[in-house]
């Protein structure tokens, strides 16, 4: 509300105020303004501040303050930086930010902080913005104002996301203290914990999230108001309100970026490229702070002009009213402090009140105590009372003053001072204040010093002068400089002034007058400066040395010479036409061309540009040296008689002429885009096209010169003109060189007298030598000094150029001021200069060539750089003839005539023979061209098995020359002892039978499979590589031996022994090559079932080994049994507890040993009982006499035993019925019965095939085979016909092309004859003669060419007829081919129909598909009966195909795994390379540190040396000033004296010795010493220069080492990044390996299942083959039919449905592996590049080390040389001092 009220008040005040025109033209004033005096009766508008408070307008404080706006982070500030736009991430739209100085005017690249002031570039619609560095979250923008301002609000518009966190702070004491305005954050609690989020008072600091959301992503705003509208402000000038508004510095701190989270998982730098701060516009609204005492503000700098003011800029200095002053009207004016200062508010102006000082003071101050004491009426105390008054109101006189009673209190003379001269009075200037006649005191009389007199003590006594206050005596004797005083007459006693010489001034005649120097004893006293008018800024020089103020790069005392490597440019600015920017041809007269000429001084550059009629030359001129008028001169050369009448020139200016610049007054003379006509006289070489056109320095102009017509009324198509250059000649008559002084007038008269101006326009004009100096003066002025030579280091001999004109010393054949181009007739600009063109005089048009390539301009049919070869298609230079290549090649060898790049499979000198692998007759006119050898296929197919072939001239057939191992007419079969299938794409290989066959025998191997058939030496196998069954050994060495196996220990179920070792197949626990031994701790080999374990008891047996035959273990005492685990013999029981005797009856027991566990004895037959002492069951009698009971007992005993067994079984069956029922009990019986019934049913259903059906099928199969054979024959015949037609067409094309070449040759010859007639007139005599001779030779050959052309025409007619016949024949063949194709399609359809019947036929032969195989013909495992399984729907076929797919999958997986392993190895190698590079870089860094330390030590040594030299220089004893100056000059190691300085030094030396007596003798005696000093000086200078160079080299080494250190750091970072990437890639590869392994396991399982299925099918096949053998022939014929059908159908074995999932998985794995491989490859490349860079850095360091060592040696050598020189220099210096002391004593 307050701000709105202020704006309304200001607007109303402006509407009611009218400025006075006179007053508005007055300069702005600060402080109090005098009231304007208006004429009577004029309507007066009051000032807006006169009756109320007033305020200046608000605005954007950024405008006009780009230099006060800074940012802590700006993208592209040091180098271009890439950034991406988030909204374009799908297309990866990225751009470059380049904020370097050279892109300052490119808003698309430059995003400096100043771009936020305006939304677009001023004057355009191009948007501008500031942008920070990528990923940098802490960024600061700061505005530093030049004064205190009132700040109202801030608006920031972002180009990207608004910051996630930021705060605004300001300072009102110019940055000494800072205060935060407000925090902004997306999450205030997280970003600024503890900061309140509610605003209660205007001074509260709060945090808001209103302007920190993610949306919008572009053009989001952040708005801040200092005084929130929701809080009412009652007193706007309260201290806390003013503190909130006032501001001198503003700072925006951005602390956090909005990110999308992708940087959390991937920390690569690429992810940071889309996160940055960007501000398109920022408005800092405010006004200058004036506290209501000003309505407008002015710039701080009074020199700030209106032209420099930027629209909308708010200035900081208030234009104060109400008698206030200050930057912000914060205090009263010096004389308006009677009331305290207050800000104006509303209608109260609170103006400052004037103090009352009786007109004796101009300023006063406010005193609060005085103000209070006066009752708050007046508090002003006068400051610095004038007129010698004092007091609050200046009502009293000051001490040492007296009051004049005759004057009014306000009179300026009311208090009269004592008026004592302070220089001549004493007692602090006290005078008598009153007239006291009695005491003799006079008011105002002063007390004087000793040599001073007068009432005021202001006069020296006679003989004294120079009244000084610090002189106790007051005055001193007169002292005049004898060198500058005329006749040394002294000074005037009253004034003390001396009488000076002509060019001397000063009270003591001790100063030279302006524009003079060098006070001396000469009659004039000083010498004139005589500064060069062009080389110096003015004619003022140094009063001692006479050195003038030189323009840039000018030197010498008078600034008349350019510095070394600089020159004085020529006055005309020449722009060569040979390098013109554009040449536009508007007619049909041709384009511009370069005409090179040998320089002769009549033109500039390397020649001319030939310009035809209706053409325009465009010159771009951007090197204007000074803004001034110029004459635009065109230098040219006419090519024919007559003036060029119609020509125009247009000057295109880049922009408007600066009205304040040097061309402001002359801008209207020649406006832009105006066509100025001119003509070019044929007898002149130059013309002024534009007269006195003013051009401005620093701008680029275009001069468009249009050569319309040579004759204004007619066209001249052949008219051309040679243009040399566009030359700009400055109008020297307007320069200050010829204006403004007497000397300038003299120079102008001399310039006109010698007609120097003509040499600027006419190159052939020979000017007077005196013009050269005047031209140099003008050129230095126009170019503001000298220009650098810039001699091209490649084309010049040195860097030094001529001082006038700047021409460098060029190498051979190099021209140009800078030696930067080749001379006409040369080319190949390089270190050795340029090479001569050497254009062939016969083959080239002239002697000039291309400056870069050296290509000469060749005449027709010639070729080569020097035009010394024939064109392609010709040979035998200079008599170029057409190449004879039988139509198979377009070019031939230019010297030999050998055809090059023969086509159509031909070769030879004239392409007259066929290439290897081809046969035929390639000669011109033959109908049989070179055809590929088909043995059995062409060489290109890779299926050729012959060394070549040839044409059988008897029948025009092909004869193949078969390679070893092939035979047949087309090498389509394998020779004896070779195998393969060469006719179907295979090859023949030598049978490998391991030298186990008779090589002289035939049929050693199968020609299809290569399996050996006649193995010898007891060998077997496909390659006789194995021993036969029952034999072993190395079959390759023919030493197979028969196996010898022990029949007891050999496993007879395994047929044979090992073929290689002879190891027999042993039974269990049997060992030995012959299987004749039991294994350790085993026995019983004689069992024939292997050996049993001894099982010796570990407690009762002594050893584990038992007897190998009986198995008896060796028992301990008290143990027995075979295994020693029982009691000893004839005892039983547990041996570990107690053994008891057997007690077997000796008559009834068969053995005295009883059962060792139970004690039961083994009885004889018929004997029983525990001890075998009674008759057994079934026997009767009295022991030991027992006999059997008989047959009856035995029969009943058997019956009872059977019934017992049956009863037991019945009980068990009953239990099963109770559990599972009756059927469960008889499951096996029911199953067997079911099988038998099903077998009978199958036999009844599967016997329905008759013999008639089989015969019918056989007939149809044979018919189909015959039809296919006939189709193959017709196809072969058609292919042969097509080949013949193609060859005929090729021959016809060759003949037609030859005819066309001859026709073009005739036309070219005719054209050349016509052109030669014209060229004879323009060329020299020798060239014309050569052309004439050449033309005569060609004319002589025309008759021959005519005959050849006639013959070719006849051949063409014949060929046309032949082509017509061939076309008819081709048409017939095409019809036959179409019929054949139709028949093939019919056969294919019929074959398809037959194929579709095959499953039904198989059903008829084999039974229903899917049934199990039976004894008759098979079933599900086959497609037809008998033989081997081959049907496509059988289980074995599916299994084989599935097995194949699994194996392919396994192969692919293996391949991918190998690729992954290879990638891992590559990554490992890359990591090793990176590690090696890191180690190298580390070693280089350590080595660079050592070099740095050594360099620092040497630098310190050099510094010590220089300190010693300086100390030596400073330690000088007192000597005459002349000797001291000479010694100082001698010790100055950086002596670079110009000739004038040397002369001055000589003059000083002469003056120094002028007062000496016997000067000649002194000079004679000291001459040797002086010579030695001079020599020492030159040696010291040379030593100093070498030391400086060494120091510079050392500094460069240090800088290079620093750069290497920085590069080392970058290399370390890059290596770390590479290691990180390698680790990531390794993790990816491990994942790929795991996934590959997981995919491999199912594939292996599938392979195992398929293998099992194959075994089952094989078993099934064996069962089928045992069945019906009568159907074997039928099966064979059906298999042949199916084979033919599958060939006709193509690829029918594809199992995409079964393997699609596997293929997709493998494809995914392959893709991921490929990605990983590419990533690894990139890492390897980066590591390799890093290695290369590191090696380069190491090489640079090694080179620097070499340089350092060399320089160090030089420094040591120089130190050794400097020591004796210093010693000798000291001796001579002592000698000079002694001589000087001697001469001084003589003088005194």
Swiss-Prot record:
Sequence ranges assigned to domain Laminin IV type B in this UniProt record: 567-783
Biological process annotations from GO: animal organ development; basement membrane assembly; basement membrane organization; cardiac muscle cell development; cell adhesion mediated by integrin; cell migration; defense response to Gram-negative bacterium; embryonic heart tube morphogenesis
Region forming the signal peptide: 1-24
Tissues/organs with expression: Found in the basement membranes (major component).
Coiled coil recorded as keyword: yes
Stretch list, region Domain II: 1189-1405
SUPFAM superfamilies on file: Apolipophorin-III, EGF/Laminin
Predominant localisation class: secreted
Region (Disordered): 23-43, 1690-1719
Coiled coil: 1255-1405, 1453-1505, 1540-1561, 1608-1762
GO terms assigned for molecular function: extracellular matrix structural constituent
Cellular-component GO terms for this entry: basement membrane; extracellular matrix; extracellular region; focal adhesion
Residue positions with a glycan: 138, 201, 232, 487, 591, 1051, 1246, 1301, 1330, 1341, 1473, 1493, 1515, 1581, 1644, 1703
Biased composition (Polar residues): 1693-1708
Disulfide bridges in this chain: 288-297, 290-318, 320-329, 332-352, 355-364, 357-382, 385-394, 397-415, 418-431, 420-446, 448-457, 460-475, 478-491, 480-498, 500-509, 512-526, 529-541, 531-548, 550-559, 789-801, 791-808, 810-819, 822-834, 837-849, 839-856, 858-867, 870-880, 883-892, 885-899, 902-911, 914-930, 933-949, 935-960, 962-971, 974-988, 991-1005, 993-1012, 1015-1024, 1027-1040, 1043-1057, 1045-1064, 1066-1075, 1078-1091, 1094-1106, 1096-1113, 1115-1124, 1127-1139, 1142-1154, 1144-1161, 1163-1172, 1175-1186
Annotated Basic and acidic residues bias: 1709-1719
Chain ranges of the Laminin EGF-like domain: 288-354, 355-417, 418-477, 478-528, 529-559, 789-836, 837-882, 883-932, 933-990, 991-1042, 1043-1093, 1094-1141, 1142-1188
Subunit field text: Laminin is a complex glycoprotein, consisting of three different polypeptide chains (alpha, beta, gamma), which are bound to each other by disulfide bonds into a cross-shaped molecule comprising one long and three short arms with globules at each end.
Protein name: Laminin subunit beta-1
